[in-house]
Amino acid sequence: MKYSVDQVNWPEEWPEKPEVTVEVSNDHEALRLQYHVKGEQLRAVTTEDQGPVWEDSCVEFFCQVPGERGYMNFECNCIGAMVGSWRLSRAEEVQPFTADEMGRIERKCTYPREAFEEKDGLYEWTVALRIPLDLIFRGKAPVFPQKLRCNFYKCADKTKRPHFLSWQKIDLPQPNFHCPEFFGEIELG
């Protein structure tokens, strides 16, 4: 399935709207996400996993397994540096993924994993992620078809033109992607 990440949730303060889609598939072993982005400005300062990738040109996937109280966040900048964790909320009971768990997430990006300051111009880029399902389902084997509650995001907090896009609308006064109450639902066949 292909989804458009096109909700500009805070248009008065952050009207920027790059073109963003994400294609989602699974092979019963892993979830595959292929983000396609076209927009102005490109930034990739963070090169290490579990660093502030959201400040760069970044795509994100937050998901919640049915019946779970918490959710997971996967955030990846345009050069493949990632943040990943399980959590109850933005700041509550955060359990960052270990280096081994992060290493199991396959990443393919348009740009090599080399830092660069913000560049002006029009850029098209992709990030492809392959996330093992046993990581998402915390060691349990999912039964297919399987539903996931989730949202897809695009952000770039520290660029000249910050933006905060989502697939599902977020009805909050300030940018915050850590809000499972606004997740939509996808089905893994």
Segments the model singles out, each with a brief description of its role:
Residues 1-189:
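Structural preference for beta-rich elements and adjacent junctions enriched in aromatics
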